[in-house]
């Protein structure tokens, strides 16, 4: 799903499953966010996060993913299941300014996994082509995502 057109199609398809016929405010918000995602080359990173969450879910690994730096208020992230915050349910919050400004930088991600499932999670991260570095045993915290090239992000855990 790393190609932007495929990514965009997936976002709209999933949004239609959630909202039905897309209200103008939802379509406008998705358009704005997708423009920023494309402009700032965030397609691969977000597609990787979708794959990670899907892989964890398919293996029955409960995870709690926290996004910071504005990505946590993204409708795209919500629609794709990366974030649980739906900005459309909170119209009183002006979240667009965070999205516009922060899509220029990679999000800070914290992924908490039970200690006894770390080996399984490491295998999933390896299968996704992510380099895993851990100083000590404990919950996984993705502290930093480093953009390497058009096809890869390194996650520092």
Residues of each region from the PLM?
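Alpha-helical scaffold/interaction cores of sigma-54-like transcription cofactors
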Residues: 1-157
């Amino acid at each position: 799903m790393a190609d932007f057109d495929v990514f965009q199609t997936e976002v709209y398809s999933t949004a239609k499953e959630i909202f039905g016929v897309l209200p103008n405010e939802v379509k406008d918000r998705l358009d704005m966010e997708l423009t920023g995602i494309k402009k700032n080359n965030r397609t691969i990173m977000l597609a990787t996060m979708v794959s990670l969450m899907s892989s964890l879910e398919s293996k029955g690994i409960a995870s709690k993913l926290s996004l910071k730096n504005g990505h946590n208020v993204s409708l795209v992230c919500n629609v794709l299941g990366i974030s649980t915050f739906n900005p459309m349910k909170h119209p009183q919050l002006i979240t667009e300014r965070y999205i516009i400004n922060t899509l220029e930088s990679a999000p800070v991600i914290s992924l908490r996994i039970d200690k006894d499932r770390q080996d399984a999670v490491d295998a999933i991260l390896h299968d996704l082509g992510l380099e895993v570095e851990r100083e000590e045993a404990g919950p996984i915290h993705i502290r930093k995502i480093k953009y390497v090239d058009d096809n890869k992000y390194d996650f520092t855990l």
